[in-house]
Design a protein with these regions (language model features):
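Phosphate/dinucleotide-binding and metal-coordinating scaffold of catalytic cores
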Residues: 1-207, 211-317
Length: 317
């Protein structure tokens, strides 16, 4: 039996849901490689949720596998998810809960997305829906404009890094300076996102969780922010997965200030950003209640938001 290589996995992804603008077809053929079954509509969310639950219990049927894998997904990740077509006919990602989750990961990602928007961070169109009493997060694909496809590049690919390599935000700022269509504005936006990650303890900010969109001959721009997940300190220490400066990733307002020059920012501007983001993130409880989070979960998540860095950030400038 032949061992599958990287090309096999690349070609095994559905053309309809393939990330970015890469498409493949056989020499001499006009039709792009695609499965016989299309992406399910959003009305299938209940069924998809049941399928993911059976998959996680190793109780899936052949029909379950056909439903959830036929459209394919090139997005990866450790959480259960599926591609769906939303009510406005847009390709979207549905993120599902796990039975053993200590708290609703999807609900708190919605909280983070709302806070991010209010802090001035660009996010995808998103919606939290309840299916059979469980929260499912819908996130619209930002590499699609109708039927048009926008080339996408992860930060890992942009830096030529490999899995397990930390990388750093200054390196991403350098990449924007070299290849960016709006380098100065995106460097500031990138800094804003680093500050936000520090203040909400978004510690899974690895290089696959940042991306760039191609703007033709102008170059690349930052994609909308995605996979924003506040994490309580008892689950993971407040250390980012990507370095804040060239060497250090520990969440710290002092480190944010000292690293600001890498993003082309004067310290006064950086402090204004830090204070502004803190004024937003301090409202996290109100936003959590907006989305229907239970009080027990709000208490469970407190350490992700309430820490010395928040107090310090509110006092800078």
């Amino acid at each position: 039996m032949r061992t599958l290589g990287e090309l096999d996995y690349l070609l095994g992804v559905s053309d309809e849901t393939r990330l970015g603008a890469m498409r493949f077809r056989r020499v001499g053929e006009d039709i792009f490689q695609a499965p016989d079954r299309g992406v399910p509509p959003v009305v299938e969310l209940g069924r998809l949720l049941q399928v993911t639950e059976r998959l996680l219990r190793d109780e899936e049927t052949d029909e379950d596998l056909r439903l959830i894998f036929a459209p394919g997904s090139s997005l990866g990740g450790a959480r259960p998810k599926a591609s769906v077509i939303d009510q406005h006919d847009h390709l979207s990602i549905a993120k599902f809960p796990k039975d053993n989750d200590e708290y609703s990961i999807e609900t708190w990602e919605e909280v983070a997305l709302r806070l991010a928007e209010r802090a001035g961070i660009e996010t995808p169109h998103h919606e939290l829906v309840q299916i059979a009493g469980k929260a499912v997060l819908l996130s619209r694909r930002f590499d699609r404009r109708g039927t048009a496809r926008t080339p996408f590049l992860s930060a890992m690919s942009m830096l030529g890094a490999r899995d397990g390599e930390r990388g750093s935000y200054p390196e991403l700022a350098d990449a924007l300076a070299a290849h960016g269509a709006r380098a100065r504005a995106d460097a500031e936006q990138l800094y804003l996102r680093v500050v936000f990650s520090v203040l909400i303890s978004n510690v899974d900010d690895h290089l696959r969780n940042h991306g760039f969109l191609w703007q033709g001959s102008d170059g690349w721009i930052l994609s909308p922010a995605y996979d924003l997940n506040p994490t309580p300190v008892d689950m993971k220490a407040r250390v980012l997965a990507t370095n804040i400066d060239l060497d250090e990733a520990t969440c710290s307002v002092d480190l944010l200030e000292s690293a600001s020059g890498f993003f082309g920012l004067q310290l006064s501007v950086a402090r204004k950003i830090i204070r502004g983001v803190a004024e937003v993130t301090k409202t996290w409880r109100d936003v959590a209640r907006e989305v229907g989070s239970r009080e027990a979960e709000i208490r469970r998540m407190e350490s992700a938001f309430e820490h010395d860095d928040l107090e310090k950030a509110l006092s800078v400038g």
